[in-house]
Design a protein with these regions (language model features):
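Ferredoxin-type iron-sulfur electron-transfer modules and their immediate structural context
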Residues: 1-163, 167-174, 451, 478-482, ...
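A secondary-structure boundary/capping signal
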Residues: 118, 150, 196, 238-239, ...
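Short, glycine/acidic-rich beta->alpha junctions
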Residues: 156, 202, 323
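Iron-sulfur cluster-binding cysteine motifs and their immediate structural context
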Residues: 127-151, 159-196, 201, 205-220, ...
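Residues that cap or flank secondary-structure elements
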Residues: 122, 152, 198, 245-246, ...
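Gly-rich Lys/Arg/Thr-decorated short loops/hinges at beta-loop-alpha junctions or inter-strand turns
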Residues: 111-117, 140-145, 187, 205, ...
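Iron-sulfur-associated redox domains of electron-transfer enzymes in respiratory
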Residues: 1-73, 217-486
Length: 486
């Protein structure tokens, strides 16, 4: 894997070790030793005060990987082995938690309360524009002439930062809050971050933004593995972006998944073909009825945004199901008694799956890589597995920005020339503001708007396995090999 930060290495390593213990039937018996083995005595503890703090962080980071969250802890003395036993019991008799994400309070470093700080670059100038312009009189001057900020009075308005002619005042971001486009993350009175589920759109931007790796998804890995071990039929439906995830042939990737124990593998691109045809017909129908524009509906993060933050956009969102929706029904039709597992790069698919009775579990590409490592499955040695059904190139193109738009236009052929299509390929604050304006005015720069939460599309999803640039390049190469088209 092309790790771009150490927090990815930590997640991968921890889940790999947990899967290894599970595979050896030692999860409950040996999990209590895992934090000690990962941070042995006298080991370096990067970013933590001591080895004991590091071990505590390993312990609590194990909870979401076991399918639990911080609310499940009622007694700090409860050992990991007890949580592991609960996780296995849930996998046998219960269902995954409804929570999608959680903040590991023990790992959260409680970043700065105030975002501005005056550095020693302050020249102690006569103008003192920082002090004069501060609306809360929070800027004071030392006897030396240098300015300083009273953090109890400061409201982080940034006026002093803009006023300083020497750029001596720096802005210190809180990375997770900075990454969140809908202000769903905020600190409590102790400085620990919390995710407001009523605002969160599950875009996953915070997941890799936190430099301490304190934000986790609630995993369903052990629920899936338990079903496979029991001998149940478990079918994997894999997102189109898998073409850009692993540096092996796609047949080897599917072969490795078969080796994990999946009954069958179905490409979500099959479902994308249904999405394309249905969405194309719906678009033409709505435009003929006089509707000014229609947006896509396949990105679950965008659907959450509309439901929670831009309800005025609802009439303009396509009613067509996502590729996962249709692929899950293809799987259920072929294997009525099977558990269906969607595998992709997306956090928000976990929320979509809660509303879809045909999808039982979600796994990410990142989790798949850890599972393969924990089970000691070498992808390059896996027996290649080929699909019996091949989807058109455009269906696989859903993985990249412009892919949905391009597929619909390709399907419509000559009719597409009359349609002006545009794309929104990153749900940041600016894009959300634009979408809100479209909904309010009922006017948009195009008649068909493709919306994806991730910059560049699903190929850059928060739970991707490959490095972004390499993944895009690999996807482009794989798409070029697929000759079938509309």
């Amino acid at each position: 894997m092309a790790f771009t930060s150490n927090i990815m290495i930590v997640r991968h390593r921890l889940l790999k070790e947990l899967v290894k213990l599970w595979n050896n039937n030692e999860l409950v018996d040996k999990i209590d030793r895992l934090p000690i083995e990962l941070s042995p005595k006298r080991s370096k503890h990067a970013g933590r005060c001591c080895v004991h703090k590091e071990r505590a962080v390993w312990k609590y980071k194990s909870l979401p990987l076991l399918g639990l969250d911080m609310e499940d802890e009622t007694d700090e003395l409860t050992p990991l082995s007890e949580y592991a036993a609960r996780a296995l019991d849930r996998a046998e008799n219960g269902r995954p938690k409804d929570n999608i994400m959680c903040v590991i309070d023990e790992a959260c470093s409680a970043c700065v309360q105030i975002n501005y700080e005056i550095t020693n670059l302050c020249r102690g100038c006569t103008a003192r524009s920082c002090q004069v312009n501060c609306p809360k009189k929070a800027v004071h001057v030392k006897e030396s002439g240098q300015a300083w900020i009273d953090h109890d009075a400061c409201i982080s308005c940034g006026i002093c930062h803009k006023s300083c002619p020497y750029h001596a005042i720096v802005y210190i971001p809180v990375p997770c809050e900075e990454a969140c486009p809908v202000k769903a993350i905020s600190k409590d009175e102790k400085g620990i971050e919390h995710i407001d589920e009523s605002k969160c759109i599950y875009c996953g931007k915070c997941l890799n933004a936190c430099p301490f790796g304190a934000i986790f998804e609630i995993s369903q890995v052990f629920d899936v593995l338990h079903r496979i071990r029991k001998g149940e039929q478990v079918v994997a439906i894999v997102a189109p972006s898998i073409l850009g995830q692993f540096k092996m042939t796609i047949e080897q990737v599917y072969g490795a998944l078969k080796q994990v124990g999946f009954t069958d593998i179905i490409e979500v691109a099959q479902g994308a073909m249904d999405t394309v045809s249905n969405e194309a017909h719906e678009l033409i129908e709505k435009l003929e009825e006089g509707q000014k524009f229609m947006t896509t509906s396949c990105c679950p993060s965008y659907i959450e945004l509309v439901n929670k933050h831009i309800p005025a956009m609802k009439p303009y969102v396509s009613d067509t199901g996502s590729p996962m929706y249709y692929a899950a029904r293809i799987a259920k039709e072929k294997y009525p008694d099977a558990k269906v597992v969607f595998i992709g790069p997306c956090v928000a698919k976990r929320k979509e799956a809660q509303r879809d009775e045909a999808v039982d579990f979600i796994m990410t590409f990142e989790e798949v890589a850890s599972v393969l490592a924990g089970l000691d499955i070498q992808m390059e040695q896996a027996k290649p597995y080929s699909m019996s059904f091949t989807s058109v190139r455009e269906a696989h193109g859903f993985a990249q920005a412009g892919g949905v738009m391009g597929a619909v236009k390709a399907y419509l052929k000559e009719e597409a020339d009359k349609i002006n299509a545009v794309q929104v390929a990153n749900l940041d604050k600016k894009a959300i503001g634009a979408l809100r304006a479209y909904a309010k005015s009922g006017k948009a720069p195009g008649q068909f708007i493709e919306v994806m939460a991730c910059e560049g599309g699903c190929i850059t999803g928060p739970c991707s396995h490959n490095e972004i640039t390499a993944g895009k390049r690999q996807l482009t190469q794989e798409l070029a090999k697929r000759k079938e088209t509309y």
